[in-house]
């Protein structure tokens, strides 16, 4: 069984027992339970495919927040030829790791 869920403006494929990384979720601490309600699609173990318009109302995904952290540094550079101008800037994006416990179809 797997599902497509929307979190942080992006879509993720999630399965029970797996960990996925999403944009940082504020207001929740590590170890707390979380419920994701914006489920776009579910494929059940019986092979049944449920698709929402845009979301499924009878499906919820429960999970646990594993950690909050920052991703690896991404370097962005500007360069102007023949002008002796060069600029490097780094960025580290915040993320939240969520372990999916259960996909419940009501």
From Swiss-Prot:
The reply on keyword Ribonucleoprotein is yes
Q: Name one GO molecular function term.
A: structural constituent of ribosome
Output a single Gene Ontology CC term carried by this record: cytoplasm
Q: Which InterPro entries match?
A: bL21-like, bL21-like_sf, Ribosomal_bL21, Ribosomal_bL21_CS
Cited SUPFAM superfamilies: L21p-like
Q: Which Pfam families match?
A: Ribosomal_L21p
Q: Which UniProt keywords apply?
A: Ribonucleoprotein, Ribosomal protein, RNA-binding, rRNA-binding
Transmembrane helix keyword on record: no
Q: Which GO terms describe its biological process?
A: translation
Name the domain of life this protein comes from.
Bacteria
Q: How does it assemble?
A: Part of the 50S ribosomal subunit. Contacts protein L20.
What function does this protein fulfil? This protein binds to 23S rRNA in the presence of protein L20.
HAMAP family under this entry? Ribosomal_bL21 (MF_01363)
UniProt lists the family membership as follows: Belongs to the bacterial ribosomal protein bL21 family.
Protein's UniProt name: Large ribosomal subunit protein bL21
- Which organism does this sequence originate in? Thermosipho melanesiensis (strain DSM 12029 / CIP 104789 / BI429)
Underlying gene? rplU
